[in-house]
A protein has these predicted regions:
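C-terminal interaction appendages of subunits in large macromolecular complexes
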Residues: 1-218
Length: 218
């Protein structure tokens, strides 16, 4: 107890000798707001080679190297840096990746494997189609499968926040073989492995939801 009394006495003495008023004042702490730096929107070009390495470059860089870019890359898309790239696979999935998450740089930069920046797994999946999310919003997509099932889907069906969704329902042992943007005045041509062809207007293709199986096309 005597030791405690001595300590308390010393603390009181120090407080009296060295005490000073607080020099700073915290005001409206409950209203403090942290704002993210706004990204300046600009058009870029998405490039992905046959090995799955993806990157974006500015439009002028692409235009200066257009011939080499077209020869070296499997997928080339003009898009906004604030948008998303949609990756459709044979097993009926759609993966999304933000353009901002894709490496941006020089034309000769290698980029990163698309597997590393999205949920796509090149060891288990195969890409059928890649497009820009914003451009797809105003389009209709035609789906065709190995077993001859087809359907049209409104692009707005794929305006989602999830990184991976089911883009179409498939029957057992079936897979997506073709996806493309279609307009009502186009014609569709289906071909069988036996060499039979069937041609019909795109307007006649049944429009369905993304979660539905298509109808028999051929």
């Amino acid at each position: 107890d005597s030791m405690a009394a001595v300590i308390m006495e010393d603390l009181d003495r120090i407080k009296k000798e060295f005490a000073r008023k607080r020099r700073t004042v915290v005001e409206n702490a409950e209203e403090a707001v942290f704002e993210e730096k706004k990204v300046e929107e600009q058009e870029v070009v998405f490039l992905m080679d046959r090995f799955g390495y993806a990157k974006t470059v500015d439009v002028s860089t692409y235009e200066r190297n257009k011939e080499a870019a077209d020869n070296e890359n499997k997928y080339i898309l003009h898009c906004m840096n604030t948008g998303k790239i949609c990756i459709f696979t044979k097993d009926g999935k759609m993966h999304q990746v933000k353009v901002m998450d894709i490496p941006y740089g020089k034309f000769r930069d290698k980029g990163q494997p698309i597997d590393n920046i999205s949920n796509y797994d090149s060891t288990q999946e195969e890409i059928v189609y890649i497009c820009d999310s914003e451009q797809m919003r105003y389009a209709k997509l035609l789906f065709a499968t190995k077993q001859g099932m087809i359907k049209k889907v409104e692009g707005t069906e794929f305006q989602v926040t999830k990184r991976t969704i089911t883009a179409t329902k498939l029957q057992p042992e079936d897979e997506v073989v073709k996806i493309q943007v279609v307009t009502e005045n186009q014609h569709i041509v289906l071909q069988t492995t036996d060499g039979f062809f069937l041609r019909f207007p795109a307007a006649e293709v049944t429009e369905k939801k993304k979660g539905a199986i298509g109808v028999r096309g051929i």
